Amino acid sequence: MVDLATPMLTQLTYEGLVDEVMGMSSGFLEVDASWVGAAQSAGTGAHRKIRLDGAQDALFDSVRDDNFAIVGEKLHAAAKQLSSDYEGRHQTNTVQELRAFVNRLGTLQSGHSSLRLHTCITEHLLQTTNTEHFHFLLEVQQNLVAGAPIAPLLQAIDELVDLGAPFLDI
């Protein structure tokens, strides 16, 4: 038996929502340039294409398949860990310890950039996922898959059409 309904449902993983809401293309995503550290273009509406790659971005790799509802918690934990790692510089007592910290500094800076990017992406996604329209759409989809009576679902679908929901959402 082939399941034709599931591919039509809204994806609820972090990577899936990024794709559905922001539109990924072959792993690339167009984002506001200020999200990736281009401070000189902040507020100008400039965009940059970035590659979301779990092999090069450990934070993305750790949240990409998670339900979007827990991504905020994971980003918060990553921020606390990063802050703790930066504070490790105060624990250096010898030249070797200082050298080890300096050697880790590049990794810490890339982790900071990744955290900033994924925090901005998550904030952008929340603008969509916190809407009444999004919750209504999920409710209709879940009721349809659960086998709820069809008459109220058809009425809900009509309501989505009346609200001007994009065709692909319905």
What are these regions (language model features)?
Residues 1-170:
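Extended, well-folded catalytic/binding cores that form a central cleft or groove in large enzyme
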